[in-house]
Amino acid sequence: MAGVGDRLGPIILGEIGDIRRFRSGKALNAYAGNDAPPYQSGQFESRNRHISKRGNPALRKACFEVMQALKLAKPQDDPVYLFLLKKEQEGTPYNVAKMAAVNKFLRIYYARAMELYR
């Protein structure tokens, strides 16, 4: 995948481990701590939520580095890069757009890796 090189690839693979232990791409995002748990109190339900950061910090940092590499490489055919550009053009704050792109990156990674086991 674009943005993942000789250094970040082994880090991501090592931190994720066996991909079959996750039931979905959403579970992989939760493992990375890149999920936004719901916040509710009575009738109030928040729309502006922060990522949980309860997951693997090394994986989250490596994925953040992948997003920085994508910004530098600018691969025009990569869906994650195009998603990142779209979010930035919508006016989404820089780090929020990056974490949304990390979410998409991990879901695509999960789908491609699980194809090997089907």
Identify what each model region corresponds to.
Residues 88-118:
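Basic, amphipathic alpha-helical segments enriched in Lys/Arg and hydrophobic/aromatic residues
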Residues 2-90, 94:
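Phosphate-backbone recognition surface of nucleic-acid-processing proteins
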